[in-house]
């Protein structure tokens, strides 16, 4: 509810949907840090109803420039397990969400930039009530030892050595300070500053350090990419192009329509949807990737004739 309230507040002040989305996401980074936050990335698909134009901003994380194909290999020649790799610095990409915020706000925002940060800053300083969702995550992470091993996460999620629980009041003054800096100076306060130095230090810390550099952060930019559209019955589905999986949505819709007919019952429709997902995801995993690095046969994959071949 905190994020929704922040978004509504922005809309009531005359902000755009983009303004509201940024404000909501900043709050989510506080109240649901396991799912959102400044250390990640995102995609934004924006529709301008006045011009009927769609634009796509790619603010996803990028691999550090020094990333190598064998970076997840251990010294003994074996590949790191999922649970070894995910908490390590090797799995951390150069964060893009702050650049996405700024790019989107410059293009589609209306309210002053600092105003978007107010609710998140106030909640960080004054505290928010821990939700069952966050408490459950901490419970699960505790079983894996993922929070208590890191001094900073232990301090935050185990104040006074007591694990947080649903209903507790939790404050995050460090997050408030970071947001204040970005609100005052813009994205440069995140990508070319002491904050950037702290990010690099954390990512490259033992026991499984990554290889992110200050140059990776300084050089990061959100990217405008094409919007892709495809037919579905008498409608048109428009979504995000690679590196997102938006194209798979169009493929799923087309495949689903090929697998059912007017006489299909609910069970058959569910089965068709599952099969459509399975087939589309197989192609996604095989063909999709970073369009700056690989050639993706997207036009062929989205061709309705391709669906008929199944």
PLM regions and their residue ranges:
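Extended, domain-scale alpha-helical bundle/helix-rich regions
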Residues: 238, 245-251, 258, 262-265
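Internal maturation/activation junctions in enzymes
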Residues: 260-310
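Noncatalytic scaffold domains of N-terminal-nucleophile
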Residues: 1-5, 17-18, 22-186, 190-192, ...
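Short helix-capping/linker segments at secondary-structure and domain boundaries
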Residues: 106-111, 185-187, 256-264, 285-289
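Generic recognition of well-ordered alpha-helical segments
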Residues: 6, 100, 178, 251, ...
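Short conserved micro-motifs at the rims of enzyme active sites and ligand-binding pockets
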Residues: 68-69, 249-251, 291-292
């Amino acid at each position: 509810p905190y994020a929704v309230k922040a978004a509504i507040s922005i809309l009531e002040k005359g902000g755009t949907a983009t303004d509201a989305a940024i404000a909501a996401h900043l709050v989510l980074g506080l109240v649901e840090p396991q799912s959102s936050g400044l250390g990640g990335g995102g995609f934004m698909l924006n529709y301008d109803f006045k011009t009927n134009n769609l634009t796509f901003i790619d603010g996803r994380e990028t691999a550090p420039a020094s990333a190598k194909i064998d970076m997840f290999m251990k010294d003994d020649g074996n590949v790191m397990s999922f649970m070894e790799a995910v908490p390590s610095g090797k799995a951390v990409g150069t964060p893009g969400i702050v650049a996405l915020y700024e790019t989107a706000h410059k293009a589609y925002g209306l309210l002053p930039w600092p105003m978007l940060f107010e609710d998140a800053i106030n909640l960080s300083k004054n505290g928010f009530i821990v939700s069952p969702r966050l408490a459950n995550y901490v419970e699960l992470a505790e079983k894996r030892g993922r929070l208590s091993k890191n001094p900073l996460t232990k301090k935050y999620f185990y104040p006074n050595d007591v694990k947080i629980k649903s209903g507790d009041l939790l404050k995050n003054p460090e997050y408030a300070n970071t947001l204040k800096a970005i609100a005052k100076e813009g994205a440069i306060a995140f990508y070319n500053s002491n904050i950037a130095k702290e990010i690099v230090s954390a990512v490259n810390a033992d026991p499984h350090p990554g290889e992110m550099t200050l140059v990776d952060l300084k050089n990061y930019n959100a990217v405008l990419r094409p919007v892709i559209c495809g037919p579905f019955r008498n409608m048109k589905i428009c979504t995000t192009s690679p590196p997102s999986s938006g194209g798979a949505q169009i493929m799923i819709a087309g495949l689903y329509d090929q697998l059912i007919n007017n006489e299909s019952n609910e069970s058959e429709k569910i089965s068709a949807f599952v099969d459509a997902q399975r087939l589309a995801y197989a192609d996604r995993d095989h063909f999709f990737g970073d369009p700056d690095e690989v050639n993706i046969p997207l036009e062929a994959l989205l061709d309705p004739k391709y669906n008929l071949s199944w």
